[in-house]
């Protein structure tokens, strides 16, 4: 297991070497189970030379990570973090969320859903994959942006009611989005409800709108969105939004017939037909916190959703990775 501490003077580019997007540092050599030594300039910074390593496991052999049991909770939450090239944010996210959830006694485990193909980012499909991976052990999920950190301890990450999903980052609290049907940022969903809605649409490549389509799924399933009550903080002090729009530019490009198709309710795709391959499962420590990273290769049918690859080059590049 790799022990990653927050080292501000080292720039680490997101999971590029063995993780397909995160450069990994370990301050001491690991045992014989470790593979993939990194022979690169970062190894010298780590002081470990060839001992800079990560543990890689075949998905078929992977045992489900057990949650951190911080209390008497009978429920277990899988914290699903869709991810690509956000390692600096992840180094803040993991210790912050662990301390936050520990104060609430929430049994949980963090799963980083790392998209390593060359298609455009697909947050919804990654969540579908993460749910399939974790749902045997965990009875509810948190769909959680890596750049949104809760500050108010009254935001309870509790097991959602039978009414429907619990939206932690509601429009009256989120620092940026304030429309009534907004369900993005942080949404907690029961296992049975996510299955009932057939998860999320797989058609949303690039940034935005997948949450709006998911709101329609919630409504069509006869469920309701609930939100925390009696929160005294507001849009400026409930969350820390660590997204830098200049450093982390969003992929808002629209190509082919994407704009038209992604404004419709998707009745064809979801949890039951997301196409992917988990290339590797990595168990890591970030500030002594166990984290599971799934290297996920998503598949795209360019005949049905050509906007997954506006450049026309991603399909060939992804084929090389398989």
UniProtKB/Swiss-Prot annotation:
Glycosylation sites: 236
Residue intervals passing through the bilayer: 10-30
InterPro entries according to UniProt: Galactosyl_T, Galactosyl_T_C, Galactosyl_T_N, Nucleotide-diphossugar_trans
Involved pathway(s): Protein modification; protein glycosylation
Function: Transfers galactose from UDP-D-Galactose (UDP-Gal) to the acceptor xylose residue in the linkage tetrasaccharide region of the glycosaminoglycan side chain of proteoglycans. No activity towards beta-GlcNAc, beta-Glc, beta-Gal, and beta-GalNAc as acceptors.
Lumenal face residues: 31-322
Gene Ontology molecular-function annotations: metal ion binding; nucleotide binding; xylosylprotein 4-beta-galactosyltransferase activity
EC identifiers of the protein: 2.4.1.133
Localization per Swiss-Prot or TrEMBL: Golgi apparatus membrane
Protein name, UniProt field: Beta-1,4-galactosyltransferase 7
Keywords noted in UniProt: Disulfide bond, Glycoprotein, Glycosyltransferase, Golgi apparatus, Manganese, Membrane, Metal-binding, Nucleotide-binding, Signal-anchor, Transferase, Transmembrane, Transmembrane helix
Binding site for Mn(2+): 147, 241, 243
Knocked-out gene: effects: RNAi-mediated knockdown is lethal. RNAi-mediated knockdown in imaginal disks causes a reduction in the wing size and a distal truncation of the legs. Also, synthesis of heparan sulfate and chondroitin sulfate is reduced in the posterior region of late third instar wing imaginal disk.
Catalytic activity: 3-O-(beta-D-xylosyl)-L-seryl-[protein] + UDP-alpha-D-galactose = 3-O-(beta-D-galactosyl-(1->4)-beta-D-xylosyl)-L-seryl-[protein] + UDP + H(+)
Lineage of source species: Eukaryota, Metazoa, Ecdysozoa, Arthropoda, Hexapoda
